[in-house]
Amino acid sequence: EVIPEIEMPAHTNSSLAAYPQLACPVEDRFIGVLPGIGGKNSEIVYCAGNDSVFTFLEDVIDEVAELFPSKYIHLGGDEASKVNWARCPKCQARMKAEHIEHIEELQSYFMTRMSNYVRSKGKEVMGWDELTNSTLPEGAIIYGWQGMGKAALKAAEQGHRFIMTPARILYLIRYQGPQWFEPVTYFGNNTLKDVYLYEPVQKDWKPAYESLLMGVQASMWTEFCSSAADVEYQLFPRLLALADVAWAQKGTKDWPAFLSRLDRVLPHVETLGMTCARSMYNIDHKVTPEKKRLRVMLSCIRPDVEIHYTCDGTEPTIASPRYDDSFTVDASTCVKAATFAQGVQMGKTLTLDLQWNLATGKPVIASNENSYVLTNGVRGSLRHTDSEWTGWYDQDASFVLDLGKKTQVNEVSLGCITNSGMAVHKPAVIRLSVSNDKKNYRQIGEIVYTPEEIFANRTAVEDALFDNLDVKTRYLRFEVKNPGVCPKGDVREGQKIWMYFDEVIVK
């Protein structure tokens, strides 16, 4: 069954580009928007005070209801900014005429009005869990998507049916394996194992909730897909794990048994011409500083494969040492590893090019739990969520590197990443100070970036370099100033900024 979704009042830039007179506010320019919540343009939504909007949407519903035999129509309702409604004379007049006191209830008016029209066509209404922020339309079926989908339970409390599609687990736009091997997308990981182990019915649920749960849904957004094969790659095999989540009896999950069944089914899926990901065979890594050495840890979500590795840069084979436990290195080392089953390499080869410098393996004092990545010898990729970047959101950063003893330092660099589409930018200022007692610091360098450098529209890794230092010191302190918010005209205008760093290099 194909259920149509007609988004309202937000995520409507495609229609507003063609019918700008329906926008709030009316714009005399093309309205484009990035994936997700894309800056100021995402604040442009349908005008709740303009009756022409409802006439237009009713015409759309008339056609959709005739085209699709499904008894359901999804009306969206998610991520609707109220900024322009709050200052729009028409919207304010609507609130006064309908005796609406709070702006959230204006969305309830909007959605209820359209819901009633859909119901007049003999259809049932579905919507995202933001509808629970105000009065729910009668009979609306709610999709729980934010976080782990708990907002849907607010609808269940009122006797509404609901569907679980938590972004944290069932958004298939997320990376399905170690990000080093995956096509670029956004956010974090939702691995095959994450999907399979998801339990939609929680122990603390009231008995009534389970009877109102209609099922589960995996959501696949295609902003980063340019072909059907790209979409299939994101769907399979995670879609098969979702089927198990939906159909299996509670408490019967068996990960190894599922993999055995999956191995029998995947060849059939591929004979149908589908593109299937093999990410479940790829290796996760973690490299941590430990007593002036680096500890290398490798893992794979499949328990039925062997990991073989080398430390001399050669390709691993079944004859290479088998990984049974973590190991340490104390010099520049090129580690390569891959998974094997029945003598055949199953996953892609992981390459860890561990480059040693005076900072490698040394402790970092910082507020972030994963600040160890600053001295673990591994450079990050263009994916700032690949586990090799440590980030600060909407705040300045300060961290101290302990070299262990007074050391001659001539050059220091700090790896920074820019991903303008995700509001990830270089700092405004980086200050470098030195100390030998960890109390009294002396500034020896400052890098100031211009707005043009900070907000360049690109994705890139760049090192902030302090050279010609000629100083003997034990402690290096980095003080980093956050640029604030993305400026007017930026693709993420008005959004707060992330700063990410991957490696401190000292020579």
Q: PLM features: what roles do these ranges have?
A:
Residues 1-125:
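Substrate-binding cleft of carbohydrate-active enzyme catalytic domains
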Residues 3-5, 45-47, 72-76, 126-127, ...:
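Structured core elements
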Residues 5-11, 78-80, 130-133, 145-147, ...:
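An acidic- and aromatic-residue-enriched active-site/binding cleft used to recognize and process polar
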Residues 9-15, 74, 80-85, 132-137, ...:
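Flexible loop/turn segments at secondary-structure boundaries
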Residues 124-130, 135-140, 146-295:
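Flexible, acidic glycine-rich loops studded with aromatic residues
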Residues 249, 253-400, 417, 426:
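Short, compositionally stereotyped local motifs that mark structural "simplifiers"
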Residues 383-445, 458-507:
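Aromatic, loop-rich ligand-recognition surfaces of beta-strand-rich domains
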Residues 443-453:
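Solvent-exposed serine/threonine-rich low-complexity stretches and specific carbohydrate-binding patches
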